[in-house]
Amino acid sequence: MLVNIRIDFKIADIETMEKSYAKLDMINAELHEKLDILEEVTLKTCNRYEIYLLIDEEVNIPTTTFIVEKNDMAINHLLRLASGLESMIMGEDQILGQIKTARKNAIKNKTIGPKLEKVFTKAIHVGQTIRKNTHINEGGVSVGSGAVELIEEKYGSLKGKNVLIIGAGEMGTVVSKALLEKETNTIVVANRTYDKARQLAQELDGEAIKFDEMNNELVNIDIVISSTGAPHSIISKERIAFLPEEHLHDMIMLDLANPHDIENDVQELGVKLYNLDDLRYVTDKNKERRNKEAIKAEAIIEDETLLLKESLKQMEITPILSSLNIEAEKIRKQELDKTLHMLDLDKKSSKKVDYLTRSITDKLLYNIINNLKEAAANNDKDTIRNAKKILLEYN
């Protein structure tokens, strides 16, 4: 059974999600204690936390906080997710990279096996296919472009503004590149690892600073965009209270981190603070066109889901067929060698006998293999289970 347990921006705001992470970790730990978890992949982004588990038995997970989907529904969700249909900004590309990273991490941690590998590889393939064959990701569709659009809605033109990017990771990079299209004055990048800040700043033709130099730089900054992976906040009312009152009232901060980087109390100083929740309401100028493209994407997902389901069903009998063929070939070869040893045959005749034994073996296995394939296609678990017992466990 494939199980997906998740919380995302569709059912919770950022604060609720932040508080729910530990609870989801606890549920996962309890499942590991009670059940034999065969495979696992974890996907964690700024606006979703998802766990995919492969379990060799039925399981009921009572929860009102999280979404729980199984088998076909879990597969369909992952394919939709990889395609950008489940994103806060429909069609954005960032989620596809995040799914690739989740798969790589699972490979590194040795928690992924053949089935989830097939599922995630298919999801990545579907995401790439949809972006290639539809226009769903065209027209400024990324969290980065959405963040910039939000700032423009709230602040007006970014022309001549000084921007501080805190965090040179994936999100910081996406937002920074969206800013390149605007006529900002200066983009300053701060990161705990200075080399990463310098690398991103070079791409932006901006300036890199060390993390502990931020206070000195804030006096020149109009817009702060923060997206670090820090477990605690890095900007608070106390930290920026030294700035002139007029400057604080003109300053806008956008917190794209989860858990949050910027404390809400900065608003008490007059700072305009926005977070990921506010991105939901960004005006989407291309929404109607992308909805049309989503219909095309849904058709691709439907076809690819059917192919994946059939492939997963056939995987159930792969070890049985492998064992059957290996054992049959082993016996055929043993008996052939005995016979050829007793008979004084020339090379041509030996080949004919070899061909004969192969033909007999293939014909004997033909109906068995076809029946197993039919059982897999019909999801006949009893037949497959019995075949495994007979051909695998008793050998």
From Swiss-Prot:
Lineage, highest ranks first: Archaea, Methanobacteriati, Methanobacteriota, Methanomada group, Methanobacteria
Major enzyme class: oxidoreductase
Binding site for substrate: 45-48, 87, 92-94, 98
Listed GO MF terms: glutamyl-tRNA reductase activity; NADP binding
Domain notes: Possesses an unusual extended V-shaped dimeric structure with each monomer consisting of three distinct domains arranged along a curved 'spinal' alpha-helix. The N-terminal catalytic domain specifically recognizes the glutamate moiety of the substrate. The second domain is the NADPH-binding domain, and the third C-terminal domain is responsible for dimerization.
Miscellaneous: During catalysis, the active site Cys acts as a nucleophile attacking the alpha-carbonyl group of tRNA-bound glutamate with the formation of a thioester intermediate between enzyme and glutamate, and the concomitant release of tRNA(Glu). The thioester intermediate is finally reduced by direct hydride transfer from NADPH, to form the product GSA.
Job description of the protein: Catalyzes the NADPH-dependent reduction of glutamyl-tRNA(Glu) to glutamate 1-semialdehyde (GSA).
Binding-site list for NADP(+): 167-172
Record's catalysed reaction(s): (S)-4-amino-5-oxopentanoate + tRNA(Glu) + NADP(+) = L-glutamyl-tRNA(Glu) + NADPH + H(+)
Active site per database record: 46 (nucleophile)
Site (Important for activity): 77
Native source species: Methanosphaera stadtmanae (strain ATCC 43021 / DSM 3091 / JCM 11832 / MCB-3)
Stored Gene3D superfamilies: Glutamyl-tRNA reductase, N-terminal domain, NAD(P)-binding Rossmann-like Domain
Pfam families per record: GlutR_dimer, GlutR_N, Shikimate_DH
Subunit structure: Homodimer.
Record-linked InterPro entries: 4pyrrol_synth_GluRdtase (IPR000343), 4pyrrol_synth_GluRdtase_dimer (IPR015896), 4pyrrol_synth_GluRdtase_N (IPR015895), GluRdtase_CS (IPR018214), GluRdtase_dimer_dom_sf (IPR036453), GluRdtase_N_sf (IPR036343), NAD(P)-bd_dom_sf (IPR036291), Shikm_DH/Glu-tRNA_Rdtase (IPR006151)
CDD domains: NAD_bind_Glutamyl_tRNA_reduct (cd05213)
Listed GO biological process terms: protoporphyrinogen IX biosynthetic process from glutamate
Protein name according to UniProt: Glutamyl-tRNA reductase
Transmembrane segments: none
Keywords attached to this entry: NADP, Oxidoreductase, Porphyrin biosynthesis
